[in-house]
């Protein structure tokens, strides 16, 4: 981050603190010091970088060797459930939008897929437009909504306006996330609410996902 910021000429101030209540402390800083966006990293098990994969494999091996024989729930040892709770705490306790970054060998965000599942997700199009201004890349919208989705007409109008007003943007024909949905994309924008849904019901597809930014309003 510091390297990229220096290349872009952006100034970043680093800050280090030790706390056993990290979420509370971070949210306190965000709220009391007037920040307008909070960006946090996801757990290592969601990453596909070599070091993080190795760490996840070691953790799995350690659990299977020492804990499984005692029938201890994996949730005691694996941070998946804890991460969900922690992310929820960041979102609920912060007075600003929150982004959770999932690193999947991130290099650049030049080909972006934006997942829209409800009227509430339309705010992602604003993030996509801002992103394209800096990357000069392209964005494609995957509209998961159906004719029975509340606000369906508003969703269609919002996406149509986005694809007409912003260069290098398209609406994908497909309506659902599959492993093939991510072919050709190196970045995904998705809302926290929709992420919770697809992470439960489209686990196979997410194995192929690119680097991702999970956003809350």
Regions found by a protein language model. Give the residues of each.
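Intrinsically disordered or low-complexity boundary/linker segments at protein termini
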Residues: 9, 24, 36, 40-217
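Charged docking surfaces used in two-component/phosphorelay signaling
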Residues: 16-24
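Membrane-proximal soluble helical/coiled-coil segments
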Residues: 1-13
């Amino acid at each position: 981050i510091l390297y990229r910021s220096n290349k872009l000429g952006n100034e970043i101030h680093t800050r280090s603190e030790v706390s056993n209540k990290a979420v509370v402390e971070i949210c306190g800083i965000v709220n009391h010091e007037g920040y307008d966006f909070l960006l946090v990293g996801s757990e290592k098990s969601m990453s596909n970088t070599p070091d993080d994969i190795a760490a996840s494999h070691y953790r799995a091996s350690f659990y299977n060797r020492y804990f499984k024989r005692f029938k201890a729930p994996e949730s005691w040892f694996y941070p998946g459930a804890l991460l969900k709770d922690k992310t929820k705490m960041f979102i609920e306790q912060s007075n600003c939008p929150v982004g959770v970054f999932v690193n999947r060998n991130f290099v650049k965000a030049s080909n972006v897929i934006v997942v829209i599942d409800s009227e509430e997700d339309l705010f992602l199009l604003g993030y996509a437009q801002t992103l394209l201004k800096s990357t000069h890349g392209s964005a494609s919208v995957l509209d998961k909504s159906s004719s029975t989705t509340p606000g369906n007409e508003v969703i269609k109008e919002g996406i149509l306006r986005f694809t007409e007003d912003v260069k290098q943007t398209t609406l994908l024909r497909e309506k659902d996330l599959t492993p093939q949905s991510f072919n050709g994309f190196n970045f995904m924008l998705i809302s926290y609410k929709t992420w919770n849904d697809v992470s439960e019901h489209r686990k196979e597809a997410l194995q192929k996902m690119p680097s991702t930014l999970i956003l809350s309003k």
